A protein has these predicted regions:
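Metal-dependent phosphoesterases centered on the DNase I-like endonuclease/exonuclease/phosphatase
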Residues: 58-148, 152
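Active-site beta-strand termini and strand-to-loop segments that position acidic
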Residues: 6, 30-33, 158-159, 184-189
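Conserved beta strand-loop-helix elements of the APE1-like EEP
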Residues: 1-12, 140-163
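Short hydrophobic/aromatic beta-strand or adjacent loop that forms the aromatic wall/cage
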Residues: 1, 24-29, 151-153, 179-183
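Surface polyanion/phosphate-binding segment centered on an Asp-His-Pro turn
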Residues: 169-190
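Short Gly/Pro-enriched turn/cap motifs at secondary-structure boundaries
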Residues: 18-19, 144-147, 172-175
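Structured beta-strand-rich core segments of catalytic domains in phosphoester-bond hydrolases
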Residues: 1-45
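Surface-exposed cleft-lining segments at the edges of enzyme active sites
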Residues: 17-18, 43-59, 95-99
């Protein structure tokens, strides 16, 4: 996990401060003047779902970490959350629901905790009904040219911070990995 910024942060913190969750380098938090930027790579539950239990524990701990930051100032969370939140966030929801890592109900519940706990999915805020908009495609069977994808990369913001977000986007046309860039446009006073 890395962040490149034109703005020098006030502070940079690695991890979430819980030993059992801090050995994989999954979180990088930057304190900026008006908000915290938290870059995250959420644990994948694994092909055989062997890490699903750990994932559930991690989701709870990560949410608590975000809420602790939010007591200080608004939070912008970005990164690979390794979950398709709604059935419109993946090409084949019926085939994958409760069978595939990234679309297990337990993982969806973790995302619900975020969205019901004060964080807004910026892309869905601006494009609530957009279909076929994905940020990840398996390298298997030519999934990307067929647009058989998943939207698992997000920008979530503290809901009171939402008026500062002017747009959210997915750059599907950019290749380079099995993921594509996602982003937001902010309107912040100088």
């Amino acid at each position: 996990t890395a962040v490149i910024s034109k703005i020098r942060p006030l502070n940079v913190t690695k991890d979430i401060g819980i030993k059992e969750h801090d050995s994989e380098g999954r979180v990088l938090s930057l304190e900026l003047e008006q908000f915290f930027l938290v870059n995250v790579y959420v644990p994948n539950s694994g092909a055989e779902l062997g890490r699903l239990g750990y994932r559930q524990e991690w989701d709870i701990a990560f949410f608590s970490y975000l809420k602790s930051l939010e007591k200080i100032k608004p939070v912008v969370v970005c990164g690979d959350l390794n979950v398709a939140h709604k059935n419109i966030d993946l090409a084949r929801p019926k085939e994958n629901y409760n069978k595939t890592a990234g679309y297990m109900q337990e993982e969806i519940n973790g995302m619900d905790r975020l969205t019901e706990g004060g964080f807004t999915d910026t892309f869905r805020h601006f494009y609530p009904d957009a279909t076929g908009r994905y940020s990840w495609w398996s390298f298997r069977a030519g999934a990307r040219p067929k647009n058989i994808g998943w939207r698992i990369d997000y920008f979530l913001v503290s809901t009171p911070f939402l008026p500062k977000v002017k747009d959210a986007f997915i750059r599907e046309e950019i290749n380079g990995s099995d993921h594509c860039p996602v982003g937001i446009i902010l309107d912040l006073p100088d």
